[in-house]
A protein has these predicted regions:
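Glycan-processing catalytic domains of CAZymes
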Residues: 14, 26-334
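Bacterial N-terminal signal peptides that target proteins for export
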Residues: 2-11
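C-terminal motif of bacterial Sec signal peptides marking the signal peptidase cleavage site
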Residues: 21-24
Length: 334
């Protein structure tokens, strides 16, 4: 599961020139014999430590991390606790329902039981648990939310995996838990919106004004609109809820896949023979996306540690946090 629903509608062609480690960043030494689960946990912990050293209230929500919460021969209890400590929230897609060619089917009872057991760990530690199911009919949407509410989760539903529009409730009002409180941590959010593809909006201003008009406690969006990152003024505008109170604005950041439309991608990499060794297999479901050996020092330097690194750009723009996607990439390397 991942969130590669990204826009190419205005994305300019960026050819990265390489990112160099600054004196303010000290990623761990690259693993010689990596244990995939532990390396993803370590990456999340390092990103958290780095971000919070720059901005102590910075929030991180991980997507697809449920499997990393299970103690196994490869994932120790210490690593599980490290992950729980590193992240402020955990999101899981298709938690209660599966999308089967547009038809909603209940999640397998055994899988649901497993997911609930895994989410009990961060929930007990006071971390936010979010769910995202892809549903279209009102009756199933209501049931999905009731299931989440009964477990203390915060649930969002979307009509499609494109995540390209604001739900009708966000436009017309009436979202669950709508409030005018100041939200400073993800665990305080009573609702959230994830919108990663702004291609349906007529312009940058239309996109920003539409988001600003929604009443959500937290919104997850892309760092970029077209070929330019959002500015600190853009983010500050989005941090105010129209009904009063402050909300959280989180930026999307993939930690398990690279994409050929991101600014770090170099032109030479379009030829598979020239790709660095840390770029692994292509994601056939999302053309232009590639699983990465995320323990690589080169990939880590792309993610954080210099002025042009991805997380540093997010921090500079004033985002309240980052949404770490493709945390289940460890499964590729088992």
């Amino acid at each position: 599961m991942n969130f590669h629903r990204f826009f190419r509608f205005l994305v300019g062609t960026f050819f990265g020139t390489g990112l160099f480690l600054s004196s303010g960043c000290t990623p761990s030494a690259e693993a010689v014999h990596p244990v995939p689960e532990q390396e993803m946990t370590r990456l999340a912990a390092d990103l958290s430590g780095y971000a919070k050293s720059k901005s102590p209230t910075f929030q991180l929500v991980g997507n697809g991390a449920a499997g990393l919460l299970e103690v196994t021969d490869s994932q120790t209890e210490e690593s599980v606790q490290q992950l729980v400590g590193a992240l402020d929230g955990f999101l899981t897609e298709s938690f209660f329902y599966l999308d089967d060619d547009g038809k909603s089917e209940p999640q397998d009872p055994g899988v649901l039981e497993y997911l609930e057991a895994m989410m009990e760990k961060p929930q007990t530690a006071g971390k936010a648990v979010w769910t995202l199911d892809y549903l279209a009919d009102d009756e199933t949407v209501a049931m999905d939310r009731a299931l989440g509410r009964a477990r203390g989760y915060v649930s969002m539903t979307a009509a499609s995996t494109g995540l390209a529009s604001i739900p009708d409730e966000g436009v017309m009002g009436g979202i669950p838990g709508e409030n005018a409180a100041d939200i400073t941590e993800v665990r305080g959010a009573r609702n959230f919106l994830i919108l990663l593809n702004p291609g349906n909006f007529a312009s940058r201003e239309d996109y920003l004004s539409s988001l600003a008009a929604t009443p959500y406690d937290a919104i997850v969006i892309d760092l970029y609109y077209g070929d330019a990152p959002l500015t600190s003024d853009d983010v500050a505008r989005l941090q105010q809820k129209p009904q009063g109170g402050r909300r959280l604005v989180l930026a999307y950041m993939s930690v398990g896949e690279a994409a050929d439309y991101r600014p770090y991608w170099q032109a030479s990499w379009n030829d598979s023979a020239n790709r660095p060794k840390w770029i692994a297999s292509a994601n056939d479901n999302w053309p232009g996306s590639y699983r990465v050996r995320y323990w690589s020092g080169d990939w880590r330097r792309i993610l954080y540690g210099s002025e042009d690194a991805y997380l540093d750009t997010i921090l500079a723009a004033g985002f309240d946090g980052a949404f770490l996607d493709v945390m289940d990439a460890w499964q590729t390397f088992k």
